[in-house]
Regions:
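Flexible, glycine/charged-enriched surface loops at secondary-structure junctions
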Residues: 27-35, 51-58, 95-96, 132-135
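Short amphipathic beta-strand starts and helix->beta connectors
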Residues: 47-53, 87-92
Length: 135
């Protein structure tokens, strides 16, 4: 029938989406974009301070939602990600496709604060030398 869904819609998802959109509009889209740009820059700066190399070094092309970092020579990416998760409760994403073992990623989309990223950086300071980082 016209105006009807062909099956029972997921009302919880609809209500969740409605609330999420309200939150975005309350904050203001320009503020949301600015917050993401700020936390992304904070993340990239922290990565550089650790002596790590960003996959995308040109700020004009860097993402404001996720930061990709090259796995340093001699570092076991799986060990890095495993120790971060099990010992520091920090989940890093690996690369995808042909870069699956070459990079790891730090996500900073949504409700991610500077304190959250600072915790990630502190954990990386501890774990990186344990998995072969010589920087």
């Amino acid at each position: 029938a016209i105006g009807q869904t062909p099956f029972t819609p997921n009302l919880s998802a609809m209500y969740g989406l409605s609330r999420a959109l309200d939150v975005l509009l309350e904050e203001g889209m320009e503020n949301v974009f600015g917050r993401h740009a700020t936390i992304a820059q904070f993340t990239r700066d922290g990565v550089r301070e650790l002596g790590l190399e960003l996959l995308v070094s040109d700020e004009a092309y860097a993402s404001n939602t996720v930061t990709a970092i090259k796995v340093p020579e001699g570092v076991d990416q799986k060990a890095l990600m495993g120790k971060m998760r099990t010992e520091h409760n920090v989940v890093l994403a690996g690369g995808q496709g042909h870069m699956s073992a070459d990079i790891f990623r730090i996500g900073h989309l949504g409700a991610v604060a500077k304190d959250d990223i600072a915790e990630v950086m502190e954990a990386l300071k501890i774990v990186l030398p344990e998995v072969g980082f010589k920087g």
